[in-house]
């Protein structure tokens, strides 16, 4: 059997930054440090950080007064920021800069007098954080069908922003539906969706043309990983989401000669290697990597951490 690895795959710059923030906070402050919500949606990453001394909580009332508290890469509402300040917490914000960019865009549109529409999935931490960062009502739209249910007059000045981990194709369809529905509408281009989301989805579309089965390494609660699996399925390829090699099933490959393998933006490369090992246990295996876009994006760490490093030097 032949395995073709997607390129790019796995960790994005926002995830790398978030994990490094937790690790540096532990190095500088000692354990424990407290992280609100999973730092990224991957249990292997979370367990690794937990073993190093990070404690994961859902609400700040679980954090002792004055302790180090880290916001996850998905972002938080302004009320959470205010709560942290009131509790005297030493806050490190690991919100992905591309998510913060969405917050800034949304506030700018509202300040310009437009009603704001957020394209995203209800209940996702990024969506909840974005809604909580906008000082006005935000209308959440999850599908093209929901556009038809909007009651705003067609000439209402509106703007849209999007969750960063959505399907590029689905998002484009919703934007086009909004543009048909409203006569005065502005918003970022679909190219403004996270670079890593676009690159991984494009790689999977290309990969799906070459394989009999697609495996996506990622967590079930990872939005971007689920979108990769969906793209494979929509391309007509049996596609499976696995957390690691233990979830690989031999029957998936009964008639397969070529398997595509990718990973969501929060999935570590060690889990990709674990899946390859599981496939190798099924029989002879040839592994190749597709040609693809090389990513060189890096995001700066919070000044609080870099200043501490400078003092140590």
From Swiss-Prot:
One Gene Ontology molecular-function label: 4 iron, 4 sulfur cluster binding
Pfam families xref list: LYTB
Binding site for (2E)-4-hydroxy-3-methylbut-2-enyl diphosphate: 41, 74, 124, 164, 222-224, 266
Pathway recorded for this protein: Isoprenoid biosynthesis; dimethylallyl diphosphate biosynthesis; dimethylallyl diphosphate from (2E)-4-hydroxy-3-methylbutenyl diphosphate: step 1/1; Isoprenoid biosynthesis; isopentenyl diphosphate biosynthesis via DXP pathway; isopentenyl diphosphate from 1-deoxy-D-xylulose 5-phosphate: step 6/6
Alphabetically ordered keywords of this record: 4Fe-4S, Iron, Iron-sulfur, Isoprene biosynthesis, Metal-binding, Oxidoreductase
Cofactor mode of binding and number, as noted: Binds 1 [4Fe-4S] cluster per subunit.
Top EC group: oxidoreductase
EC number: 1.17.7.4
Residue numbers binding dimethylallyl diphosphate: 41, 74, 124, 222-224, 266
A biological-process GO annotation: isopentenyl diphosphate biosynthetic process, methylerythritol 4-phosphate pathway
Residues forming the catalytic site: 126
Catalytic activity entry: isopentenyl diphosphate + 2 oxidized [2Fe-2S]-[ferredoxin] + H2O = (2E)-4-hydroxy-3-methylbut-2-enyl diphosphate + 2 reduced [2Fe-2S]-[ferredoxin] + 2 H(+); dimethylallyl diphosphate + 2 oxidized [2Fe-2S]-[ferredoxin] + H2O = (2E)-4-hydroxy-3-methylbut-2-enyl diphosphate + 2 reduced [2Fe-2S]-[ferredoxin] + 2 H(+)
CDD domains: lytB_ispH (cd13944)
Residues forming coiled coils: none
InterPro entries found in the cross-reference section: LytB/IspH (IPR003451)
Positions annotated to bind [4Fe-4S] cluster: 12, 96, 194
Cofactor field: [4Fe-4S] cluster
Family: Belongs to the IspH family.
The protein's role, per its UniProt record: Catalyzes the conversion of 1-hydroxy-2-methyl-2-(E)-butenyl 4-diphosphate (HMBPP) into a mixture of isopentenyl diphosphate (IPP) and dimethylallyl diphosphate (DMAPP). Acts in the terminal step of the DOXP/MEP pathway for isoprenoid precursor biosynthesis.
Name of this protein: 4-hydroxy-3-methylbut-2-enyl diphosphate reductase 2
């Amino acid at each position: 059997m032949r395995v073709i690895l997607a390129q790019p795959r796995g960790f994005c710059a926002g995830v790398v930054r978030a994990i490094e923030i937790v690790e540096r906070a532990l190095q500088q402050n000692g354990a424990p440090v407290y992280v609100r919500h999973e730092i990224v949606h991957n249990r292997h990453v979370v367990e690794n950080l937990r073993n190093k001394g990070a404690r994961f909580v859902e609400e700040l009332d679980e954090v002792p007064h004055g302790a180090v508290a880290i916001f996850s890469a998905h972002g938080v509402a302004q009320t959470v920021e205010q709560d942290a300040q009131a509790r005297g917490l030493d806050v490190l914000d690991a919100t992905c800069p591309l998510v913060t960019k969405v917050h800034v865009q949304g506030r700018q549109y509202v300040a310009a007098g437009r009603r704001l529409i957020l394209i995203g999935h209800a209940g996702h931490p990024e969506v909840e954080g974005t809604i909580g960062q906008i000082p006005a009502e935000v209308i959440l739209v999850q599908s093209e069908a929901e556009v038809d249910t909007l009651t705003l007059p067609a000439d209402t000045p509106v703007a849209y922003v999007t969750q960063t981990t959505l399907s590029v194709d689905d998002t484009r369809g919703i934007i086009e539906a909004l543009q048909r529905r409203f006569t005065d509408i502005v918003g970022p281009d679909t190219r403004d969706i996270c670079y890593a989301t676009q690159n991984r989805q494009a790689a999977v579309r290309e990969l799906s043309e070459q394989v009999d089965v697609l495996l996506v390494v990622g967590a079930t609660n990872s939005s971007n990983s689920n979108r990769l699996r969906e793209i494979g399925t929509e391309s007509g390829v049996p596609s499976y989401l696995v957390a690691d090699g233990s979830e690989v099933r031999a029957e998936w490959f009964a008639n397969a000669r070529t398997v595509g393998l990718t990973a969501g933006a929060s999935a570590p490369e060690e889990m990709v290697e674990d899946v390859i090992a599981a496939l190798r246990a099924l029989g002879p295996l040839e592994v190749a990597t597709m040609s693809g876009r090389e990513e060189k994006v890096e995001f700066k760490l919070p000044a609080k951490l870099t200043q501490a490093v400078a003092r140590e030097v």
